[in-house]
């Protein structure tokens, strides 16, 4: 099976995509670059700007149009921050937020087995734990990104990060 990842946004997203690539590789998937045929397409979205949301939807629409039998996944900050809107995006077979990244592979395997569309966006909770996502290597970067903290406790009126990433939690 072949899987293609498309990552928008920050280095945290790059780190999390690296962890997802490792999980899929360990399950026997081959990681392919954008533009190649794949059985699964995963977009790790950014929602800091509306442009990121649009780009995520556009990329998944194209993936579904060019590979109608493929499983498409919308994950990351966009569905986490705007779950109702993301859940309505029918081009995504799996819609999930920033929590429980380890469940993505299991849900993709269910979809490949014929399971109906899955929307799994859990809201962030107070006391939520830091999710350890080990990354052994980065395919497309010469430097590794190490995630030491996630979230934000400030509630700036103009910023979506606390909504997308939840409360601050760290490795320590």
Give the residues covered by each predicted segment.
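Proteins enriched for Cys/Gly/acidic motifs involved in redox and nucleic-acid/cofactor modification
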Residues: 1-172
């Amino acid at each position: 099976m072949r899987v293609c990842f498309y990552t928008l946004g920050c280095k945290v997203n790059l780190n999390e995509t690296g962890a997802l690539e490792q999980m899929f590789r360990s399950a026997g998937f081959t990681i392919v670059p954008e533009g190649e045929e794949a059985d699964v397409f995963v977009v790790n979205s950014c929602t800091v700007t509306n442009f990121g949301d649009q780009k995520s939807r556009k990329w998944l629409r194209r993936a579904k149009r060019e590979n109608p039998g493929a499983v498409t996944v919308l994950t990351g900050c966009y569905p986490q921050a705007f779950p109702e809107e993301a859940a309505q995006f029918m081009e995504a077979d799996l819609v999930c937020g920033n929590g429980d990244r380890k469940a993505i592979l299991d849900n993709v395997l269910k979809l490949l087995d014929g399971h109906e569309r899955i929307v799994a966006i859990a809201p962030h909770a107070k006391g939520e734990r830091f999710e350890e996502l080990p990354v052994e290597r980065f395919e497309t970067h010469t430097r590794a990104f190490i995630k030491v903290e996630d979230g934000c406790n400030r509630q700036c009126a103009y910023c979506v990060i606390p909504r997308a990433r939840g409360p601050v939690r760290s490795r320590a």
